[in-house]
UniProtKB/Swiss-Prot annotation:
It is a multi-pass membrane protein. This is Cobalt transport protein CbiN. It comes from Methanothermobacter marburgensis (strain ATCC BAA-927 / DSM 2133 / JCM 14651 / NBRC 100331 / OCM 82 / Marburg) (Methanobacterium thermoautotrophicum). Keywords: Cell membrane, Cobalamin biosynthesis, Cobalt, Cobalt transport, Ion transport, Membrane, Transmembrane, Transmembrane helix, Transport. The chain crosses the membrane at residues 7-27, 67-87.
Amino acid sequence: MDKRHTIMLIAVAVIAIAPLVIYSGLGEDQGYFGGADDSASKAISETGYKPWFQPIWEPPSGEIESLLFALQAAIGALIIGYVFGYYRGRGESPE
C-alpha cells in the first residue's frame, strides 16, 4: 500500500475514534447527546402548542418506524448515486 494511502487511513481512523475517546461517558447526564427531536418537542410543549391535525397513519412500533426511515434513506442514496453516476458517465462518453 502506498504511504499516502496509509496516512489517509490513519487520519480517518483518528477522526472516527477521537470523539468516542474524548466524550466517553462525559455529558450523558447533562443531555449533550440528546436528539434534536427531543429538544424541539420540549421547546414546543413549553409553549402550550396544540397540533392542528393528527397523523393519517402511525407505525405500530418503533422498529417499523426505523425500517421506514432506513428505507427512505436507502432510496435517497440510490437516487443521489444514480444522478452522480449519470453525470459522470455522460462527461466521459465519447461523442
